[in-house]
Amino acid sequence: MFLGTHSPRLDEKGRIILPAKFREELASGLVLTRGQERCIYVFSEKEFARVHEQMREAPISSKQARDYIRVFLSGASDEVPDKQGRVTIPPALREYAGLGRELAVIGAGSRAEIWDAQAWNEYLAEKETAFSETDDPIPGIL
C-alpha cells in the first residue's frame, strides 16, 4: 500500500528517486500513466494488470469508456527502476503533469501519484477545507 507524501526532485535527465517505502513494491517494474487532475499515476505491474482487466470489462459501445481507456492507456509507459531506485519519467508525461524540478510523490493506497510540488500544494489547500467539513457518507469510503 502506498502512503504518505514525499518530496523528491526531478534530475536533469528526467528521473526521480522513488521513495524508499515504495521501492520494494515497484522494484520489478511499474507503469506510469496520465492521472486525473494533471498528475502521473504510478502503478505496480500487478496493480496495473488488475486495473486493465477492469477496463476490459467496460462495454465497447460506451463512448465514455472508450475515451477514458484511450487517454489512460495511450499515455502509459512501463519502466523498471535502476539499482539506486531511480525511474525516468517520459517527456510527454512530464509535460502533461507540468512537472518542474520540485515534486510531490503521494501515496494513494493502490497507487502513487507524482505531482509538481506547487500544483500539489495548491490542490491540497483547495481540497483540505472540503475534506475537514465532510460529514455526508462518501460511497465506498465513509
Swiss-Prot record:
Sorted UniProt keywords: Cytoplasm, DNA-binding, Repeat, Transcription, Transcription regulation
| Domain SpoVT-AbrB, chain residue ranges per copy | 5-47, 76-119
Q: Where in the cell is it found?
A: Cytoplasm, Nucleoid
Q: Which GO terms describe its cellular component?
A: cytoplasm; nucleoid
Name of one Pfam family that matches: MraZ
Q: Name one GO molecular function term.
A: transcription cis-regulatory region binding
Q: What Gene3D superfamilies does its record include?
A: Transcriptional regulator MraZ domain
Family the entry assigns: Belongs to the MraZ family.
Query: How does this protein assemble?
Result: Forms oligomers.
Name of the protein in its database record:
Transcriptional regulator MraZ
- Give the organism, scientific name: Pseudarthrobacter chlorophenolicus (strain ATCC 700700 / DSM 12829 / CIP 107037 / JCM 12360 / KCTC 9906 / NCIMB 13794 / A6) (Arthrobacter chlorophenolicus)
